[in-house]
Amino acid sequence: MTDDCSDHPATRLTHSGRADKSSYGPVNPPVVRASTLLFASTADLKAATGSRRTYGRHGTSTSMTLEQALCELEGAADCLLTPSGLSAISTTLLALLQPGDDLLMSDACYEPTRALCDGLLARLGIQTRYYDPLIGAGIADLLQPNTRVVFIEAAGSLTFEIHDVPALAAAAHAHGALLVADSTWATPLGWDAFALGIDVSLHAATK
């Protein structure tokens, strides 16, 4: 199969994630349910140590193939599958924030995201402040010394506001903060998140 694919969405969807030679022939990557793996030699096992290809809890060839496809569609450097969209949001925020940090969250956010911020994050000493999703460059006035993340949704979860992403990105990056997007509605086919200045793009892929 040639790697010279066009940028047409249907072509990208068809070809993405198919470079993994571990499928041994099937057109579609097979579903791997195994948690334990065999290695041809102890040298191979040692070489794999530290990678995710040592135990099913870290992922299987099936999940890694899907991650690869999502990376290709989104133009991302790397990708991690989680059990749900909310787990992707919580994993990201817990990785980027620590006690004493400030999070600027779009007031149009998904309700379970708000519950996460007002519940678990608050108990961990992480402050969340909600901003008008139409604020644009005015977000600069809300940034504090401890603001680490500005979170947007593309588009607003229930009310569908469209954020001025380049303006938000410019303000956040000038401050040293990251811009994180819930891209569930937009999808990689609907916008180029990273070209617009997004640092981390999340999806509830089941949508």
Where are the regions a protein language model picked out?
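Conserved PLP-enzyme active-site core in the AAT-like
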Residues: 2-5, 19, 80-207
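Short conserved active-site loop signatures built around small residues
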Residues: 2-32
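Short, hydrophobic/aliphatic alpha-helical segments
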Residues: 7-13, 68-72, 198-199
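Residue-level signal for pocket-adjacent positions within structured domains
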Residues: 8-9, 28, 50-53, 203
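Histidine- and aromatic-rich ligand-binding microenvironments
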Residues: 28-43, 132-134
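Conserved N-terminal alpha-helix of the aminotransferase class I/II PLP-enzyme fold
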Residues: 36-90, 113-119
